[in-house]
């Protein structure tokens, strides 16, 4: 079959392990979703900063794509204690 070609109407993308996510009930490669996006609101995992991910509740780390022409990154949950501590300290200072 075609990678990322499956439907995600009733179940999530099976191809998430190869970097695919659901958009408009069809699975697409994450970088394709990001490249074709008009705004960050086009997909819940699109971001331009770590704060975007935290605000959306979809992670705490915005990872850019290697292709510099793609203006949006992809949200992930970073489990590093150092990362979480750094953010906590930053928020403590600014609030």
UniProtKB/Swiss-Prot annotation:
Tissue expression remark: Expressed in stem, shoot, root, leaf, pod and nodule but not in flower and seed (at protein level).
Pfam families associated with the record: Albumin_I_a (PF16720), Cyclotide (PF03784)
Claim: DNA-binding is one of the keywords in the record: no
Covalent link (Cyclopeptide (Gly-Asn)) residue numbers: 1-30
Free-text description of this protein's post-translational modifications in UniProt: Contains 3 disulfide bonds. This is a cyclic peptide.
Disulfide feature: 4-20, 8-22, 13-27
Residue ranges of the propeptide: 31-95
GO biological process terms held by the UniProt record: defense response
UniProt KW keywords: Disulfide bond, Knottin, Plant defense
InterPro entries attached to this UniProt entry: Albumin_I_a (IPR032000), Cyclotide (IPR005535), Cyclotide_bracelet_CS (IPR012323), Cyclotide_sf (IPR036146)
Domain notes: The presence of a 'disulfide through disulfide knot' structurally defines this protein as a knottin.
Family membership: Belongs to the cyclotide family. Bracelet subfamily.
Role this protein plays: Probably participates in a plant defense mechanism.
Protein name: Cliotide T5
Organism: Clitoria ternatea
Highest classification ranks of the organism: Eukaryota, Viridiplantae, Streptophyta, Embryophyta, Tracheophyta
């Amino acid at each position: 079959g075609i990678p990322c070609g499956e439907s995600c109407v009733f179940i999530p993308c099976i191809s998430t392990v190869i970097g695919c996510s659901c958009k408009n009930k069809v699975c697409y490669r994450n970088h394709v979703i990001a490249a074709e996006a008009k705004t960050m609101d086009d997909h819940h995992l699109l971001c331009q900063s770590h704060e975007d991910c935290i605000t959306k509740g979809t992670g705490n780390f915005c990872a850019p794509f290697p292709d510099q022409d793609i203006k949006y990154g992809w949200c992930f949950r970073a489990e590093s204690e150092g990362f979480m501590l750094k953010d906590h300290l930053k928020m403590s200072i600014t609030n």
